[in-house]
Amino acid sequence: MEEVPHDCPGADSAQAGRGASCQGCPNQRLCASGAGAAADPAIEEIKEKMKTVKHKILVLSGKGGVGKSTFSAHLAHGLAEDENTQVALLDIDICGPSIPKIMGLEGEQVHQSGSGWSPVFLEDNLGVMSVGFLLSSPDDAVIWRGPKKNGMIKQFLRDVDWGEVDYLIVDTPPGTSDEHLSVVQYLTAAHIDGAVIITTPQEVSLQDVRKEISFCHKVKLPIIGVVENMSGFICPKCQKESQIFPPTTGGAEAMCQDLKIPLLGKVPLDPRIGKSCDKGQSFLVEAPDSPATVAYRSIIQRIQEFCSQRLPEGENLVGS
């Protein structure tokens, strides 16, 4: 599939789907039909629903297997350690929902209330929602086309009764697909704080992260920063660090310097992280002295600082 062209006339333009730059665009037929110009009424409904959510953070990755969902889960765990902070974790990886397993909530079900779907609560201040809670078995495959995935995301954002929330963390699938376009479209009016992008040190991962950064720029999604996962290996016996995935091109640090993107931190590979996820436990609690935990906590603090500097919806910087 080709990328949306840089000089796209926009769905509202008279040239939508007909201009020279529209040739080869995957959305050409949709734009030409005029359907793309009609505002989705769900956007306003979601905006109203999200008024009780202070901060909204998307967690992205260019590739699968780089630890994106693990990071999302531990970001939620870390923020929720403050009992006065209300945290919500939304899993929109529709075809690969791993959050229920990582959070120790496999087998839980979603209940309907008068005010919408009730999230599954791990703690009084940590609610979770995932398509995994809607499956009869964790082994069931979700084989859906884009429109059905988009409809599910719309329901999660509009129909879940999150209540008063300080942080909504959205765990997305890898890449830049329908799910990403949908969540950005639905949440933009509700003020997204930004995206955290997860990578590993190898160039094969960084290549896709650059595409993810390009996606963020195109849809005007602020980038909170990049996290380099699996950045060195901590031996559980001697606690010494060695390189499993050498940063052949300088890793995330060099890429961030080149693109002027904040590097939030580097999380070393600790085998206990995987064990904690398999058990559905917080690694931050199980291994508080691990260098990986220290890195996680530093990154979480930087994300909190970023969000605290974001202006409330409707306010603008002087002179902007």
Swiss-Prot record:
Q: Which residues bind [4Fe-4S] cluster 2?
A: 235, 238
Superkingdom is Eukaryota
Chain positions recorded as ATP binding sites: 62-69
Q: Could you tell me the keywords of this UniProt record?
A: 4Fe-4S, Acetylation, ATP-binding, Cell projection, Cilium, Cilium biogenesis/degradation, Cytoplasm, Cytoskeleton, Iron, Iron-sulfur, Metal-binding, Nucleotide-binding, Nucleus
Record's cofactor remark: Binds 4 [4Fe-4S] clusters per heterotetramer. Contains two stable clusters in the N-termini of NUBP1 and two labile, bridging clusters between subunits of the NUBP1-NUBP2 heterotetramer.
Name the protein family: Belongs to the Mrp/NBP35 ATP-binding proteins family. NUBP1/NBP35 subfamily.
Q: What does this protein do?
A: Component of the cytosolic iron-sulfur (Fe/S) protein assembly (CIA) machinery. Required for maturation of extramitochondrial Fe-S proteins. The NUBP1-NUBP2 heterotetramer forms a Fe-S scaffold complex, mediating the de novo assembly of an Fe-S cluster and its transfer to target apoproteins. Implicated in the regulation of centrosome duplication. Negatively regulates cilium formation and structure.
Name of the protein this chain belongs to: Cytosolic Fe-S cluster assembly factor NUBP1
Instruction: Please give the organism.
Output: Bos taurus
